[in-house]
Amino acid sequence: MSLPVTLPLIDHLALRVRDERRSRTFYERALEPFGVEVVESSRGPGFAIEGGGDFWIEEGEPPAAPVHVAFAAADRATVDKFHRAAVEAGGRDNGAPGLRPHYHAGYYAAFVIDPDGNNVEAVFHGDRQLPAT
């Protein structure tokens, strides 16, 4: 089954972080391969992503349980660059770039734990085919 390309389901996401400066540095570097633009607001920095789906961080007490957020990459090279940049920015490797066929054919992703313990993923869906059920 192929998924249609439509508007993003999520318009924006705000993530609470313990140390805004540390997290801003991490996300600026980790998301650089996506070509994000850093924007300022009264609540904290945001990362504008072409096509929608803005991502914001704001200082405060993070949720008790870690969050998993995935950023859609245009290709495998972007996934690779994200992983390298995120680890160099202080993230902890949580899954090197590679195929994850147990999700679906063509699912190419990398995972990094951010400074607050959240699981941050970059994913390229390839042909975007889902497994038959």
Tell where the protein language model's regions lie, with residue ranges.
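Ligand-binding pocket scaffold of soluble enzyme catalytic domains
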Residues: V38, N94-A96, I113-D116, F124-D127, ...
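Core segments of cupin and vicinal oxygen chelate
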Residues: A14-D54
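Vicinal oxygen chelate
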Residues: V17-R22, A70-D116
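Glycine-rich acetyl-CoA-binding "A-motif" of GNAT/NAT acetyltransferases
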Residues: N119
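N-terminal beta-strand motif that seeds the catalytic metal site of vicinal oxygen chelate
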Residues: M1-R24, V69, G126-T133
